[in-house]
Amino acid sequence: MPIITLPDGSQRQFDNPVSVMEVAQSIGAGLAKATIAGRVNGERRDASDIISEDATLEIITAKDEDGLEIIRHSTAHLLGHAIKQLFPNVKMAIGPTIDNGFYYDIDLDRSLTQEDLDALEARMLELAKTNYDVVKKRVSWQEARDTFESRGESYKMAILDENISKDDRPALYHHEEYIDMCRGPHVPNMRFCHHFKLQKVAGAYWRGDSKNKMLQRIYGTAWADKKQLADYLHRLEEAAKRDHRKIGKALDLYHMQEEAPGMVFWHNDGWTIFRELETFVRTKLKQYDYQEVKGPFMMDRVLWEKTGHWQNYGDLMFTTQSENREYAIKPMNCPGHIQIFNQGLKSYRDLPLRMAEFGSCHRNEPSGSLHGLMRVRGFTQDDAHIFCMPEQVESEVTSCIKMVYDIYSTFGFENIQVKLSTRPANSIGTDEMWNKAEADLAAALTANGLAFEIQEGEGAFYGPKIEFALRDCLDREWQCGTIQLDFFLPERLSASYVAEDNDRKTPVMIHRAILGSIERFIGIITEEYAGFFPAWLAPVQAVVMNITDSQAEYVQQVVKQLSDAGLRVKADLRNEKVGFKVREHTLRRVPYMLVCGDKEIAEGKVSVRTRKGADLGTYKVEEFVEMLKKQVRGRELKLLGEE
């Protein structure tokens, strides 16, 4: 006679074991119709699963995050159902959920085309609209293996052989004649899986191992209703338009080439943006009382062995040899900063010591993971390390948080997700040390009025950390900033200070990054602004153009005035119609276009237009210079005439 406790605290008693669906039906027909699965004692279970003892139960519907994930997982099975009907000889591998969708890896004797994807999608919809029931059956290990052996599903057999104990009773999900194996849960009926889109096919090695066979990975997205799907596809279209790789090429910001994979060739305009970001961050370093340093980009293997990087990070490090010594190109800046700290005796009076560097780092990322500026091998970190005493941690973290938000707000990022990662199983240090460190980070976040998500056990082995993720205009999340406590590295590299009692003590080190990789951050803001950089960041802030040759000298005078004021300006004296010039510079996303005709010369003015098409009328040259300088100085996000 199980007693089921519902989320509102109410209880229902049943005379016999009862399924999740039957509990939903006892509450109401509407809830039963919406039921996808249940959370029994906090564990996700299928709607058909039986509850035989007292338990808590939450019904999962399409409105829940878990419900949407289950819809996506079941849509992956629906894809398997359709593939087996259209390509009976295909072998199915794995089909998990991912962010916003799912994929299925398959072994097929020919490459899939876009026409194949269209046909698969049509068959999936045809099957889903029959609203068939998904039937779950628990079977013995041997019965599961016999089932897949009879169907020639060698990858499913391998999963059973290598990953599932022979004592287990795996769950087989029956989609009419199609059978798949999964931990579940899955939807009880395919009426929940009507809103999906197959997106692309890519290659993927079985088990992620390049020694294994290359399979075809079919990616798809699935949503709870038609509007959610349409909104997501619209965001994808917008993301494609904003792709920093396309915009970077169109605006001549940078390029990459095969001879230097994952390394950026910055062109003049892209490098201008890069240097402006550095200049901006430098103003903040001064404001928040940091020293700026510069360490070598390559150091002896001996040092990296001391830090543990050689043993734990070796695959991602580029190495070289000289005069019988082995060196590693630095993947991060922290060991170098400790070397600087160790030069000369440090007293407690010297702490906190805040050390920052625009450090050039290299990591040997797999070639398949490289993606424009977002994932590179050579990058520059706006890195800092703060050496402090334990009692200074909370105040220093508070200062870091303020700096993070100060910088992000300048770029218009207001929606920032904050996560606190706590002690992992493989941590070093005492319980007391960790408890205080986690409490200090939480207290700093709370003192700043920040809501945060706790990620249990997700901290580094050497200390807890705070992560800051930016949510952009397309609702994508970009993890950029980190504040990481480190009890480990300073001790390993013999960092110490003389405490007030004259004892030698090891400082706490706080790793702090805000932009993260400057290259990646440029990719992020290129997509956020769609290449319409605010005036202070724009490589060219204004173009001055003539209507006829008679205004050429005046144009040059205006250009000199703007240039002398420290503004980035160009002249366009080509023998082209002014409309053609305006269109061209609009496509180049130049913030302001200044047109000089005879009337403007007579009045000592310029006619001002913006890249968004606003006609701002005429300005005295001095007025425009002051207006633009004010915008640049204030790092304003919008141009004149923009709301």
Curated annotation (Swiss-Prot):
<dbReference type="InterPro" id="IPR047246">
    <property type="entry name" value="ThrRS_anticodon"/>
</dbReference>
<keyword id="KW-0067">ATP-binding</keyword>
<dbReference type="Pfam" id="PF00587">
    <property type="entry name" value="tRNA-synt_2b"/>
</dbReference>
<feature type="region of interest" description="Catalytic">
    <location>
        <begin position="243"/>
        <end position="534"/>
    </location>
</feature>
<dbReference type="InterPro" id="IPR012676">
    <property type="entry name" value="TGS-like"/>
</dbReference>
<comment type="subunit">
    <text>Homodimer.</text>
</comment>
<dbReference type="InterPro" id="IPR002320">
    <property type="entry name" value="Thr-tRNA-ligase_IIa"/>
</dbReference>
<keyword id="KW-0436">Ligase</keyword>
<dbReference type="Pfam" id="PF03129">
    <property type="entry name" value="HGTP_anticodon"/>
</dbReference>
<feature type="binding site">
    <location>
        <position position="334"/>
    </location>
    <ligand>
        <name>Zn(2+)</name>
    </ligand>
</feature>
<dbReference type="GO" id="GO:0000049">
    <property type="term" value="F:tRNA binding"/>
</dbReference>
<keyword id="KW-0820">tRNA-binding</keyword>
<dbReference type="Pfam" id="PF07973">
    <property type="entry name" value="tRNA_SAD"/>
</dbReference>
<dbReference type="GO" id="GO:0005524">
    <property type="term" value="F:ATP binding"/>
</dbReference>
<dbReference type="GO" id="GO:0046872">
    <property type="term" value="F:metal ion binding"/>
</dbReference>
<dbReference type="InterPro" id="IPR018163">
    <property type="entry name" value="Thr/Ala-tRNA-synth_IIc_edit"/>
</dbReference>
<dbReference type="InterPro" id="IPR012947">
    <property type="entry name" value="tRNA_SAD"/>
</dbReference>
<dbReference type="InterPro" id="IPR036621">
    <property type="entry name" value="Anticodon-bd_dom_sf"/>
</dbReference>
<dbReference type="GO" id="GO:0006435">
    <property type="term" value="P:threonyl-tRNA aminoacylation"/>
</dbReference>
<dbReference type="GO" id="GO:0005829">
    <property type="term" value="C:cytosol"/>
</dbReference>
<dbReference type="InterPro" id="IPR006195">
    <property type="entry name" value="aa-tRNA-synth_II"/>
</dbReference>
<dbReference type="InterPro" id="IPR004095">
    <property type="entry name" value="TGS"/>
</dbReference>
<comment type="similarity">
    <text>Belongs to the class-II aminoacyl-tRNA synthetase family.</text>
</comment>
<protein>
    <recommendedName>
        <fullName>Threonine--tRNA ligase</fullName>
        <ecNumber>6.1.1.3</ecNumber>
    </recommendedName>
</protein>
<keyword id="KW-0648">Protein biosynthesis</keyword>
<feature type="domain" description="TGS">
    <location>
        <begin position="1"/>
        <end position="61"/>
    </location>
</feature>
<feature type="binding site">
    <location>
        <position position="511"/>
    </location>
    <ligand>
        <name>Zn(2+)</name>
    </ligand>
</feature>
<dbReference type="GO" id="GO:0004829">
    <property type="term" value="F:threonine-tRNA ligase activity"/>
</dbReference>
<dbReference type="InterPro" id="IPR004154">
    <property type="entry name" value="Anticodon-bd"/>
</dbReference>
<dbReference type="InterPro" id="IPR002314">
    <property type="entry name" value="aa-tRNA-synt_IIb"/>
</dbReference>
<keyword id="KW-0862">Zinc</keyword>
<keyword id="KW-0030">Aminoacyl-tRNA synthetase</keyword>
<keyword id="KW-0479">Metal-binding</keyword>
<keyword id="KW-0547">Nucleotide-binding</keyword>
<dbReference type="Pfam" id="PF02824">
    <property type="entry name" value="TGS"/>
</dbReference>
<dbReference type="InterPro" id="IPR045864">
    <property type="entry name" value="aa-tRNA-synth_II/BPL/LPL"/>
</dbReference>
<keyword id="KW-0963">Cytoplasm</keyword>
<dbReference type="InterPro" id="IPR012675">
    <property type="entry name" value="Beta-grasp_dom_sf"/>
</dbReference>
<feature type="binding site">
    <location>
        <position position="385"/>
    </location>
    <ligand>
        <name>Zn(2+)</name>
    </ligand>
</feature>
<keyword id="KW-0694">RNA-binding</keyword>
<dbReference type="InterPro" id="IPR033728">
    <property type="entry name" value="ThrRS_core"/>
</dbReference>
<comment type="function">
    <text>Catalyzes the attachment of threonine to tRNA(Thr) in a two-step reaction: L-threonine is first activated by ATP to form Thr-AMP and then transferred to the acceptor end of tRNA(Thr). Also edits incorrectly charged L-seryl-tRNA(Thr).</text>
</comment>
